């Protein structure tokens, strides 16, 4: 346990806190150490070979120097052997789960693991795989390995002499016929394999569990095999990531001598408030990533629930939902103003139409002296209002009494019934209707209204606005304007809708509007965002 002890000394000297999950892994190693063959020689050979031959391939081109924590990970991966049922000495550890905060060099570390296996692993004709959610992510790790063949003096010589070469199938070390290939997360393609080393990258993105399909082939056909699951945590629930976290926290897995879990994460959400605790999730912080970068992300997330979710998931290792309320009470506060700001002013319109069930909203915005002013006409049908529970009906009644919610005595929202109210707003304010944005799925229903107010030969005054993640930029722009008090509204129904509004966070960090509860209507928010997009389009 030489490298465990070195890591513990390093942590003490540098104020790195170990969470309860890593403490459990240490207890497990101590138990295993007393039962199996310790391979200090193999671990040290791997570490020295990596540090002698490999380079950082981003930033300054300099040789890799593994930190004590990373050396300990190598001790867990390579440090123990057992005698199998055939009397053969084999590597003990088949599975490693590394849950580690973003920016901690996981892919670079895995590149060294692959190359160590290809050149020093001694498995003639063996195959190694990197498996990822899609080809782009698989290529990220694959390219880390290939870059080493150009940066490393030793591998460059191998490369030039065609000992280490790139083929259509992947990378090959000719001396041992070992290969490294990339593969996407496809269960059918994974059937029947016989790989010896499997790197499952960013497992938080996986829906179905491909690991067993890959591991089955390795287990049945290889004496020495290892699968490594790496992730920075994520926002996709009920997939492979949740399954792995639950498994590697369990007592059953603690007593499985052929696996190690490295769950670097906070133990609860409250711990994020004390920066000293961040080392639980980012044990290499200060080296990778930099303290300043993580602090900046933390500060940017203040006042933004969606960014807070992402920070806790990707930096602090916590399983988080991919949906979060987006606007804070401070963002949605009312500011009184006079509708005269619209007088003779270019006015942009967004319309979110729902025939029944949700609200229909027509939002008007204009710009004046560096601020954006908004006013929204919100509609429902009386029969829907009458079916509300008492609490909701009291809330809607307040909106009706304030003149902010208009109840129509029809079975569903008829577009023709909106026209008198739009006319009334235009007459009362003297605004100049300029452009309209609308959901393309509703165009045929809205066509008459759109042509009435926004007809032009080229159609420049009308824009079909795609819904979902396509609205990402304008969702974030609306948030920014509200935070900076540059978007002014004075309607309680809009405040309510903004407070109801959640965002779903996509894999690339994009947002789309959603709601957590059916009773939480967000249509005024959507209409306002479309109107804002039209205002911006007129400036470009």
Curated annotation (Swiss-Prot):
Gene3D superfamilies: P-loop containing nucleotide triphosphate hydrolases (3.40.50.300). Its EC number is 3.1.-.-, 3.6.4.-. Keywords: Endonuclease, Hydrolase, Magnesium, Manganese, Metal-binding, Nuclease, Viral genome packaging, Viral release from host cell. It holds the Pfam family TerL_ATPase. It comes from the Viruses. The keyword Membrane does not apply. Mn(2+) 2 binds at residues 352, 523. The keyword Transit peptide does not apply. Mn(2+) 1 binds at residues 352, 424. Its cofactor is Mn(2+); Mg(2+). One of its GO terms (molecular function) is metal ion binding. Disulfide bonds: none annotated. InterPro entries: P-loop_NTPase, TerL_ATPase, TerL_nuclease, Terminase_largesu-like. Binds 2 divalent metal cations per subunit. Belongs to the skunavirus terminase large subunit family. The terminase large subunit acts as an ATP driven molecular motor necessary for viral DNA translocation into empty capsids and as an endonuclease that cuts the viral genome to initiate and to end a packaging reaction. The terminase lies at a unique vertex of the procapsid and is composed of two subunits, a small terminase subunit involved in viral DNA recognition (packaging sequence), and a large terminase subunit possessing endonucleolytic and ATPase activities. Both terminase subunits heterooligomerize and are docked on the portal protein to form the packaging machine. Interacts with the terminase small subunit; the active complex is probably heterooligomeric. This is Terminase large subunit. The lineage of its organism: Viruses, Duplodnaviria, Heunggongvirae, Uroviricota, Caudoviricetes.
């Amino acid at each position: 346990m030489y490298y465990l002890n070195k890591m513990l000394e390093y942590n003490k000297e540098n104020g790195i806190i170990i969470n309860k999950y890593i403490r459990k892994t240490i207890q497990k190693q101590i138990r295993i150490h007393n039962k199996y063959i310790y391979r200090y020689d193999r671990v040290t050979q791997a570490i020295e070979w990596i540090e002698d031959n490999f380079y950082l391939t981003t930033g300054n081109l300099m040789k890799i120097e593994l930190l004590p924590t990373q050396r300990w990970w190598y001790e867990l991966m390579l440090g123990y052997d057992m005698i199998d049922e055939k009397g053969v000495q084999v590597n003990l550890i088949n599975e490693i789960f590394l849950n580690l905060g973003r920016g901690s060099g996981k892919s670079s570390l895995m590149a060294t693991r692959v190359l160590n296996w290809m050149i020093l692993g001694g498995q003639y004709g063996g195959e190694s795989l990197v498996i990822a959610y899609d080809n782009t992510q698989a290529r990220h790790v694959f390219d880390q390995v290939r870059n080493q063949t150009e940066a490393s003096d030793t591998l460059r010589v191998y490369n030039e002499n065609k000992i280490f070469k790139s083929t259509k199938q992947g990378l090959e070390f000719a001396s041992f016929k070992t290969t490294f290939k990339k593969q996407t997360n496809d269960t059918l393609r994974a059937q029947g394999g016989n790989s010896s080393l499997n790197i499952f990258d960013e497992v938080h993105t996986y829906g179905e569990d491909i690991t067993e399909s890959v591991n089955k082939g390795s287990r049945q056909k290889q004496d020495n095999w290892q699968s490594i699951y790496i992730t920075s945590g994520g926002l996709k629930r009920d997939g492979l990531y949740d399954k792995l976290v639950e498994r590697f926290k369990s007592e059953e897995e603690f007593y499985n001598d052929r696996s190690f879990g490295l769950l670097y994460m906070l133990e609860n959400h409250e711990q994020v408030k004390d920066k000293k605790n961040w080392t639980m999730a980012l044990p290499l912080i200060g080296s990778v990533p930099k303290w300043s970068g993580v602090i900046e992300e933390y500060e940017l997330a203040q006042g933004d629930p969606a960014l807070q979710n992402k920070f806790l998931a990707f930096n602090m290792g916590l399983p988080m939902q991919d949906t979060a309320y987006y606007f804070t009470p401070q963002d949605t506060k009312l500011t009184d103003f006079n509708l005269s700001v619209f007088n003779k002013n270019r006015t942009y319109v967004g319309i979110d139409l729902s025939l029944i069930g949700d609200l229909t909203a027509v939002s008007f915005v204009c710009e004046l002296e560096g601020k954006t002013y908004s006013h929204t006409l919100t509609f429902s049908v009386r029969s829907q209002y009458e079916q509300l529970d008492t609490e909701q009906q009291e809330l809607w009644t307040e909106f009706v009494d304030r003149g902010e919610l208009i109840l129509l005595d029809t079975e569903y929202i008829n577009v023709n019934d909106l026209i008198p109210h739009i006319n009334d707003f235009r007459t009362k304010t003297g605004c100049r209707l300029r452009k309209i944005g609308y959901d393309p799925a509703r165009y045929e229903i809205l066509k008459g209204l759109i042509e009435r107010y926004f007809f032009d030969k080229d159609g420049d005054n009308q824009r079909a606005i795609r819904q979902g993640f396509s609205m990402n930029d304008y969702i974030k722009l609306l948030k920014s304007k509200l935070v900076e008090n540059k978007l002014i509204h004075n309607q309680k129904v809009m405040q309510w809708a903004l407070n109801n509004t959640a965002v779903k966070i996509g894999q690339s960090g994009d947002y789309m509007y959603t709601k957590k509860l059916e009773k939480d209507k967000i249509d005024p928010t959507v209409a306002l965002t479309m109107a804002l997009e039209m205002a911006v389009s007129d400036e470009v």
